[in-house]
């Protein structure tokens, strides 16, 4: 009876977490449509996402402590690990129980990248001429002088000798890159990789002397990179990651016939 009640409690937490994720997705979709329709952005979207994040985080903690109470010996550490990873860290970075938390984070980061990218893609100034990017580079280079420059000398050299002569190419990469990163994070497709490229752009903006939302979005992007195993679970990564696998553990799409035959013999199933 006790185990049945515990299972019902776990199911309830799971469904409530999923409900928060659905609400965050609908709210973010509305925000994106509203912003791309040339309406002024408001703070209600961010405030609502913060509330949803706190609720999802509280539910994730509840699921963690519930799992620990039901299965205290579930987490086993390798004998050669000098500093075993704490159970709570393993839960948030590798357990699907924390996927709703990362889903809310994805909605925030993905929407920021998608709206920023769409604004650039739809602007002629960010086209092949590289007009907007050239102006951005010029403003950044102006910050590279003085005793404590906001833009370091080596990065100013990179902007002047690499980016500026190829402004059209970099304009294309930045505008479409931001759009692709936003879409990838929102739909949860190779989320860790998409977030990694996003963090790379955040760092470049910061090195150019532009603060804006880059520290916050960059920090959230790093969290998505660290939690790559589970942050896209409520998304396409639930299918893509098992199919693609890892360099040291190929997925179903890259398994050899011998491996498939071995798995079939071990499981007793055949096609």
Language model segments and positions:
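Transmembrane-helix motifs of polytopic, lipid-linked glycan transferases
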Residues: 180-184
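Extended, low-polarity transmembrane helix blocks
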Residues: 1-177, 187-271
């Amino acid at each position: 009876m006790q185990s049945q009640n515990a299972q019902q409690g776990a199911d309830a937490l799971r469904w409530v977490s999923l409900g928060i994720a659905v609400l965050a997705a609908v709210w973010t979709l509305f925000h994106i449509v509203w912003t791309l329709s040339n309406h002024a952005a408001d703070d209600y979207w961010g405030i609502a996402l913060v509330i949803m994040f706190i609720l999802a985080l509280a539910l994730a903690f509840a699921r963690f402590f519930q799992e620990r109470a039901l299965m205290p010996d579930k987490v086993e550490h390798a004998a050669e690990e000098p500093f075993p990873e704490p159970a709570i860290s393993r839960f948030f970075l590798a357990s699907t129980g924390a996927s709703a938390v990362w889903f809310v984070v994805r909605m925030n980061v993905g929407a920021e990248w998608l709206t920023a990218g769409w604004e650039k893609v739809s602007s002629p100034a960010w086209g092949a001429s590289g007009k907007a990017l050239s102006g951005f580079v010029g403003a950044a280079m102006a910050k590279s002088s003085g005793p404590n420059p906001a833009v370091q000398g080596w990065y100013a050299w990179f902007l002047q000798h690499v980016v500026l002569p190829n402004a059209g190419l970099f304009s294309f990469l930045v505008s479409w890159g931001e759009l692709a990163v936003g879409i990838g994070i929102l739909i949860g497709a190779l989320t860790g990789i998409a977030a990694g490229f996003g963090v790379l752009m955040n760092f470049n903006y910061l090195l150019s002397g532009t603060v804006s939302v880059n520290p916050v979005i960059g920090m959230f992007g790093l969290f998505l990179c660290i939690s790559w195993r589970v942050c896209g679970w409520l998304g396409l990564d639930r299918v893509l990651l098992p199919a693609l696998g890892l360099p040291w553990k190929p997925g179903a799409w890259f398994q050899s016939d011998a491996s498939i035959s071995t798995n079939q013999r071990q499981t007793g199933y055949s096609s």
